[in-house]
């Protein structure tokens, strides 16, 4: 063999070796070096981070009857264990996303090869992508860093670096978790569309059921949506979603998880949804949920935040004594961080009863949408400057409208964008497309109107609030802050303070009973005059003229809400004593201690009033309203428990006498509609209230098992009915209470019955029939008022 041939063979051998290193060895060495670099220098999650992955878990609010009424969340996600997920979901995910899930250790090189050769070259995507479920989990739990820039090829270098990090993280996940734990974490972490993160939120949003209850076609529908949550959203694109669902079902059959007959049956089934998007504006008890968030997030009170010293002092005491108030700022996690309602997956056990809450919301809606709003809308048609009455002057009207414009979102946005006052105000006169609240099935209507007209329209919508408390515990069972949380965020239960009218009178009668008087004590029905700063004031009489000068009982006085009798009692005890009684019964808002307090000018909240009236069926014991019983972390560890604070405000004798007095209101007075229209039987006490110009309508009533109160009025006090027959508390507020109680009494799951009774104190033997006066207490309300009892109510001057 010639030297030339030998030299050529040697060169060929060297070239082969070089090309071997170029094509095979160098990539292997490079990949190995890259992996080592990633492990050594990249920010790979630590063991502790792998044990406690950073996953945004929704906080759940769980009702007293065990229903999750809503969540606080950035991502609507609630973790469920592997055992609580239907096998159909597991099989659908594995068959579609990672067919060799149980055969690899985090990275499936066989699948990677398939992606390179079969999927890319042969365009066969039936076996999915190259990323394993574990890699997808790593990408979800530990988000990718931003790509590098600044040099040629930086994007590709970054992507390789990131992919290597995902590989290493996936392998570490496989070493720390079982396959069951990994697939459960994956299903709990991914986004399914419609705001649903995690399989629990998805199954509840699309089907209204638990993950363990999902059948083959439901599981396939949800898993299929993961690829493109909007495109394959069954509520938005049912045809595309069904095509994708059927593909997933085919993959399940191909993998051997279901039979061919099951496949055909599932693919032939229609899509059946029980679709309900869970957001902060919808769902049960939205005003209550918002109140809980604010209560738990509150900061320590500062004097500069309060107009009145006594309200600042009350909240300062509450900060020290009420563990729920500012809980998030008073407590920390074991690592020293503050708890986060939107991320930490807390379980907050609230006192709301889901059934009572639903009945309360339905009662408010029925009264406003079917009765009051149509009447008010009809009355507004004849008004010069609706929704305000005709006696409003132009200056006041313009002031109210200007104030409303400055409080609007449109005005705030304009100021933020640097527009002048003139430019912003000009926008309010230009018609634009908008969506506004409406009493229809959708809860809104799309229309075109000027922002000025939209302000007037929104002000014309009557507002209402409702709260119910269980007497024996003080636990709040129902809470409705307004007609629609989405459009009217203002909470009229705890935020709104309105004049209480004649619902204040029971405090004065309570003082009289506590001081030794009885319901049957007799007084002369005469106007009373007070001297105030060298001036005189006489409360306007609400009684028929031919009843003036007659002897009546105190029970008659409260039954018919006589201003004369209330003024008589105020003369006996004085405003300071009445104010002290109100404080003892839980009234914390600021009010003036003046003689006119006896007829109701004080601005108080519905929450305060209901809690105070709850003292009567509670045998004289006042209880602060309780909203939350305990808080747990996501693993069920108890973080806090809350018990109510009970104080004896009045004697059980006084409480029972007040029950007797207020039963007269229901049986023969301004609350008689509960008997003759709503056919409510059993023992009920209560009091109506109406303020000047019919601006506010009140009713607070109680049975032995439930105390509930209602307020109805306009956003502005000047928005009101013209006629007392329509704007009284007995016409506006009392029907909500009646509808609510009817629903509760029909529910066999609620411990409320018309057979419930108020128990007299042991040893009490007092005749409360109250006969012998010039006018009998049991006189028919129609005769007393000279009109039907449905038409009017008491009012103050």
Regions found by a protein language model. Give the residues of each.
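Short, glycine/proline-biased beta-turn/loop segments that scaffold the active-site neighborhood
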Residues: 270, 495-551, 624-639
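Non-catalytic structural connector segments
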Residues: 259-419
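N-terminal type II signal-anchor transmembrane helix
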Residues: 2-62, 100, 120, 371
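Peptidoglycan glycan-strand catalytic modules in the bacterial/periplasmic cell-wall system
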Residues: 56-58, 62-265, 269-319, 327, ...
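Active-site SXXK
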Residues: 93-94, 247, 252, 360, ...
């Amino acid at each position: 063999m010639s030297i030339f041939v030998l030299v050529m063979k040697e060169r060929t051998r060297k070239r082969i070796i070089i090309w071997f290193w170029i094509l095979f060895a160098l990539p292997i060495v490079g990949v190995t070096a890259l992996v080592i670099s990633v492990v050594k220098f990249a920010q790979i999650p630590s063991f502790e981070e792998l044990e406690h992955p950073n996953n945004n878990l929704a906080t759940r609010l769980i009702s007293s009857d065990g229903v999750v009424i809503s969540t606080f969340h950035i991502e609507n996600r609630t973790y469920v264990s592997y055992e609580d997920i239907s096998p159909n979901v597991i099989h659908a995910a594995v068959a579609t996303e990672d067919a060799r899930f149980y055969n690899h250790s985090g990275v499936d090189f066989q699948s990677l090869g398939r992606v390179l050769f079969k999927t890319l070259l042969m365009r066969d995507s039936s076996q999915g992508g190259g990323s394993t479920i574990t890699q997808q989990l790593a990408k979800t739990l530990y988000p990718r860093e931003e790509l590098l820039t600044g040099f040629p090829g930086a994007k590709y270098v970054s992507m390789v670096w990131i992919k290597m990090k995902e590989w290493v993280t996936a392998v570490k996940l496989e070493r720390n978790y079982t396959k069951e734990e990994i697939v459960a974490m994956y299903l709990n972490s991914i986004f399914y569309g419609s705001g649903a993160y995690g399989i629990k939120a998805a199954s509840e949003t699309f089907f209204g059921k638990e993950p363990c209850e999902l059948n083959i076609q439901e599981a396939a529908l949800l898993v299929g949506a993961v690829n493109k949550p909007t495109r394959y959203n069954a509520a938005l694109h049912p045809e595309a979603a069904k095509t994708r669902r059927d593909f997933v079902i085919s993959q399940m059959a191909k993998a051997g998880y279901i039979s061919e007959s099951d496949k055909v049956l599932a693919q032939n089934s229609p899509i059946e949804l029980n679709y309900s998007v869970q957001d902060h504006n919808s769902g049960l008890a939205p005003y209550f949920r918002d109140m809980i968030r604010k209560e738990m997030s509150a900061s320590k009170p500062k004097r500069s935040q309060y107009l009145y010293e006594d309200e600042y002092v009350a909240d300062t005491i509450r900060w020290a004594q009420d563990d729920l108030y500012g809980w998030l700022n008073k407590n920390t996690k074991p690592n020293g961080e503050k708890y986060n309602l939107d991320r930490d997956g807390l379980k907050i056990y609230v006192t709301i009863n889901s059934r009572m809450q639903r009945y309360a919301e339905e009662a408010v809606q029925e009264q406003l949408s079917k009765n009051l709003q149509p009447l008010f809308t009809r009355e507004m048609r004849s008004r010069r400057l609706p929704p305000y009455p005709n006696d409003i002057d132009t200056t006041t009207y313009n002031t109210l409208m200007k104030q409303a414009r400055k409080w609007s979102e449109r005005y705030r946005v304009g100021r933020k964008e640097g527009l002048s006052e003139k430019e912003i105000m000009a926008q309010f006169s230009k018609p634009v497309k908008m969506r506004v609240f409406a009493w229809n099935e959708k809860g809104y209507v799309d229309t075109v109107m000027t922002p000025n007209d939209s302000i007037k329209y929104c002000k014309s919508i009557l507002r209402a609030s409702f709260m119910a408390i269980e007497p024996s515990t003080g636990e709040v069972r129902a809470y409705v802050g307004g007609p629609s949380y989405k459009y009217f965020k203002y909470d009229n239960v705890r935020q709104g303070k309105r004049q209480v009218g004649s619902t204040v009178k029971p405090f004065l009668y309570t003082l009289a009973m506590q001081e030794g008087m009885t319901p049957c004590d007799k007084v002369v029905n005469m106007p009373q005059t007070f001297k105030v700063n060298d001036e005189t004031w006489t409360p306007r009489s609400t009684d028929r003229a031919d009843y003036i000068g007659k002897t009546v009982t105190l029970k008659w006085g409260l039954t018919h809400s006589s201003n004369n009798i209330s003024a008589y009692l105020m003369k006996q005890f004085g405003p300071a004593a009445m104010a002290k009684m109100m404080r003892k019964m839980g009234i914390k808002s600021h009010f003036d201690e003046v003689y006119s307090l006896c007829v109701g000018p004080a601005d108080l909240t519905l929450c305060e009033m209901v809690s105070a009236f709850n003292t009567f069926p509670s045998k004289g014991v006042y209880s602060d309203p309780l909203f939350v019983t305990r808080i747990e972390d996501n693993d069920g560890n108890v973080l806090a428990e809350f018990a109510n604070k009970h104080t004896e405000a009045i004697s059980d004798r006084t409480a029972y006498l007040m029950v007797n007095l207020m039963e007269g209101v229901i049986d023969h007075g301004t609350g008689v509609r509960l008997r003759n229209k709503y056919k409510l039987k059993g023992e009920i006490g209560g009091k109506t209230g109406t303020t000047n110009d019919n601006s506010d309508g009140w009713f607070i009533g109680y049975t032995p098992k439930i105390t509930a109160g209602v307020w109805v009025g306009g956003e502005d006090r000047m928005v009101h009915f013209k006629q007392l027959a329509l704007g009284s508390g007995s016409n506006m507020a009392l029907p909500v209470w009646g509808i609510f109680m009817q629903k509760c009494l029909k529910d066999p799951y609620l411990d409320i019955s018309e057979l419930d009774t108020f128990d007299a104190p042991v040893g009490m033997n007092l005749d409360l029939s109250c006969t012998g006066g010039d006018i009998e207490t049991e006189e028919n309300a129609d005769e007393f008022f000279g009109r039907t009892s449905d038409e009017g109510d008491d009012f103050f001057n």
